[in-house]
């Protein structure tokens, strides 16, 4: 990246890792001073960064993102990626108990036909992957020397829009 920027004759002042840049834009100074874990749930990956005493002190890339969840839905339900993304964003939730057990989601499939899945089934697919990611975050935090300094958690990124994610994280 640096070489491409130089080849374009653009002068760089500094290079900042994406999770640190997210933290600098999303967190207030008090959070960064007291100790905060920022979880940025992106499309391909999720990033965690811990700020303490105003500075980033720990970063980790998690190989699970919003696209992973969408692929899980597409594969499990044998539907297109695009339809899986629509189901995730419009009907999905992270907590199975928050889904309507009597509600079935109808959606079109190729050939003009339609299919349906239950709302709890969709929620279970989403929960399994989100739970895996959150366990990874928790294990990574516990293995680090920073577990005791984290006073709060901030979740950002596109994946943070999943319904009931904040409640699940508590």
Question: What are the roles of these predicted feature ranges?
Answer:
Residues 59-61:
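Residue-level detector of high-confidence beta-strand sites
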Residues 63-83:
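A conserved active-site cap/scaffold subdomain adjacent to cofactor or substrate pockets
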Residues 134, 138-152:
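Phosphate/pyrophosphate-binding loops at sites that engage ATP/ADP/AMP, CoA/4′-phosphopantetheine
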Residues 38-45, 51-54, 63-67, 157-160:
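A short acidic Gly-Thr/Ser loop motif
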Residues 95, 149-169:
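Glycine-rich phosphate-binding loops at beta-strand->alpha-helix junctions
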Residues 1-37, 55-56, 77-82, 86-123, ...:
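Nucleotide/phosphate-binding catalytic cleft detector across ATP-hydrolyzing
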Residues 71, 120, 124, 128-135, ...:
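Feature representing long, continuous alpha-helical segments
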Residues 5, 40, 73, 137, ...:
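Residue-level signature of catalytic and energy-coupling elements of molecular machines
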């Amino acid at each position: 990246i640096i070489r491409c920027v130089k080849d374009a004759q653009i002068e760089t002042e500094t290079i900042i890792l994406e999770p640190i840049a997210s933290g600098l834009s999303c967190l207030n100074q008090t959070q960064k001073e007291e100790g905060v874990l920022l979880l940025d749930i992106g499309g391909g990956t999720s990033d965690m960064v811990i700020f303490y005493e105003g500075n980033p002190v720990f970063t980790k890339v998690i190989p699970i993102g919003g696209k992973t969840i969408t692929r899980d839905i597409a594969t499990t339900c044998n539907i297109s990626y695009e339809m899986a993304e629509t189901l995730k964003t419009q009907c999905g939730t992270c907590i199975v108990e928050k889904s309507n057990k009597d509600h079935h989601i109808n959606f079109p499939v190729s050939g003009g036909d339609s299919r349906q899945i239950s709302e709890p089934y969709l929620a279970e697919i989403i929960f399994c992957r989100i739970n895996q990611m959150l366990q990874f975050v928790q294990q990574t935090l516990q293995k680090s020397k920073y577990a005791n300094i984290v006073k709060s958690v901030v979740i950002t990124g596109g994946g943070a829009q999943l319904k009931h994610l904040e409640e699940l994280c508590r």
